[in-house]
Structure formats: C-alpha cells, structure tokens
C-alpha cells in the first residue's frame, strides 16, 4: 500500500530532468558503478513499460558544448580512453549544431543517455496503483501509526514493514533525526523552443532536455542556503541571458518550477532499516540520482527487507 498526499509540496521527481547518463560531463569521468545502476534502471523501466503499456525510455545522444580550451582538450583526451561513451560529432551533427547554437570551443558527443518520461511514468504508475486498490491519496499522519518491532498498524492497514520515502521531509522524521540530511533546492525552466531538434540533449553551463513536443526542460541550479521554495528571479534572468548567448533560436519561458531535493552530507544514499526498529525502513537521499540509481537501490532494499541477511545499501543505518 502506498500513501501519498496528492497536493503536497512540489516533489523533486516532478522537477527533475530525469536523465540516465553514465558520464559526469562536468568532470569528464565515468559515474561510479554506472554499469550496475544503469543496467538495473533500464531493466526496471522496460518492465514498467510492459506493465503500463506506455513508452517511458528514450535513448539519445548528448551534445556537450565546451566552455573553454581546457575542457576541449580534456574531452579530446578522454575520447581516446572512453570511445564507447565519448565520440566526435558527424559532419551532419556539426552542421546541425552550428545552425542552432553559438559555440567557440567545439562540441563532444556523449551517449547513449536515456531520457525518462517522468511525468507520464508518475501519472501512469499512480493510476495503476489506484486501480489495484494500492494507493491511498491522503496526508500520512504518523501519530495514527502504531509501530512495533515486528508489525505496523495504520488505521485499517496492517503490515510487517513501513518504508518512509518522504524526500526532503524525511529530515523531520523522528526515526531518522540522526541521519546526515542536508537542505538543497533546485529549479528549472520549461522552455518553448519549437524549431530545436528534440532528438538530442544539449549541455553547456545549463542543460536542455526534450520534454513535451516543442518544449525543453532547462536547468538546473543548486542552492544550499534558502528560506523558501519561491522561484529565484535572479537565477532565471541569468539563465535566460546564457540562453540568448548560446541559442540562435528564439525561446519562451513557459514555466518556472522549484522543489527541495532530498540530499545528505557526502551525497550518501539512505536505503535500509532502522537499527532499533526493524519494521521501519527508509528510502531517501538520492538527490539528483533518483531516476538513475533508484531502481537498483530499491531492489537491494527489497531483498534486505525480505531477507535481513542481505546487506542494505546505506551504511548510515547500520
């Protein structure tokens, strides 16, 4: 049974660009354990496509625009070391990028990357659970939850385990007050760029990811000190200025979205059971890695819950 408030605070999963990418494009290095996480993610989303009868995954190439000569040289060196992931553009791709973008230091091609149709996934999965009688759309009230080491009772629902997947709100959960939660907010713009080809992801100091037809997700920023989740107008103006310098095409801002990310000190994932209350588990702290690392971590947690001898993914809980 899933309990989820339908109209709560903005969820980071809704604001996310939802991209699976094996390469850290800023450092030009491979993401740690990328083969393990990506294999599990692709298998999970393909299985969900079959279950839901919709398309959720789309393989793409990412064009990485170099900001300076140092970054260009770094990518040229890495291309020789990582030819399966970093390539030169074809003549047709060079012509395409020159038509739509201004660029001084060249471009590398990273791929494949996978775009997840996050909005469709979340909506379809919610409907699937609801039709199965497995979704309770209300605010969870922990005061009404009776939790014992061997069982959990919430209103009329009896269970052996409760898994808290609260995102940024997890830092206020008394069971996990000693975990190293930190605050981080991110925001993105939804842009209308009708003539920009939607078969690619474009990365500069900001990233453009195809969304709905003619629309692109543009983001994202990271802010560690904040008092609210209101759109940052200064960031928006700076981003629009960067877009005007980078894009040769006109664009229009359709929306400006903000959400608080569930992050931890050291960017450590939290997936495991409470050391003193084995019926209580947590799945949190994935930050910007939720769509890419979440499936593998969730599978590990499920194995641990059904067989406690199986290790959990988070060292912070044990």
Q: Where are these predicted regions, by residue range?
A:
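Glycine-rich FAD pyrophosphate-binding loop
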Residues: 1-14
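A short, glycine/Asx- and small/polar-enriched loop/turn
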Residues: 103, 147-153, 157-158, 263-268, ...
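Helical element adjacent to the flavin cofactor pocket in flavoenzyme catalytic cores
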Residues: 108-161, 165
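Flavin-binding catalytic cores
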Residues: 194-196, 213-215, 223-266, 273-277
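Dinucleotide-binding Rossmann-like beta1-alpha1 core, especially the glycine-rich loop
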Residues: 18-99
């Amino acid at each position: 049974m899933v309990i989820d408030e339908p109209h709560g605070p903005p969820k980071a999963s809704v604001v996310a660009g939802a991209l699976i990418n094996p390469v850290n494009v800023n450092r030009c290095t491979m993401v740690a354990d990328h083969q393990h996480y990506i294999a599990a993610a692709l298998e999970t989303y393909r299985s969900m496509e079959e279950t839901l009868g919709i398309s959720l995954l789309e393989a793409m190439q990412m064009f990485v625009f170099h900001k300076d000569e140092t970054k260009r040289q770094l990518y040229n060196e890495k291309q020789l070391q990582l030819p399966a992931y970093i390539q030169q553009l074809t003549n047709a791709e060079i012509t395409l990028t020159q038509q739509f973008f201004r660029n001084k230091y060249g471009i590398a091609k990273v791929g494949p990357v996978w775009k997840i149709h996050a909005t469709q996934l979340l909506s379809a999965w919610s409907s699937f659970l609801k039709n199965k009688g497995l979704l309770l759309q209300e605010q969870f009230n922990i005061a009404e939850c009776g939790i014992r080491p061997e069982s959990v009772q919430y209103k009329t629902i009896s269970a052996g385990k409760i898994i808290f997947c609260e995102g940024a709100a997890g830092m206020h959960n008394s069971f996990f007050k000693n975990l190293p939660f930190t605050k981080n907010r991110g925001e993105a713009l939804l842009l209308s760029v009708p003539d920009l080809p939607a078969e690619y992801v474009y990365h500069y100091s900001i990233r453009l990811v195809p969304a709905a037809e003619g629309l692109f997700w543009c983001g994202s920023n990271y802010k560690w000190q904040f008092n609210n989740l209101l759109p940052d107008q200064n960031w928006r103006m700076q981003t629009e200025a960067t877009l005007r310098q980078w894009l040769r095409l006109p664009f229009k801002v359709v929306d400006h979205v903000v959400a608080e990310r569930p992050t931890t000190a050291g960017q450590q994932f939290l997936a495991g059971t409470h050391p003193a209350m084995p019926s209580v588990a947590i799945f949190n702290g994935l930050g910007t890695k939720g769509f890419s690392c979440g499936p593998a971590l969730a599978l590990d947690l499920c194995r641990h819950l059904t067989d406690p001898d199986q290790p959990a993914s988070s060292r912070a809980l044990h």
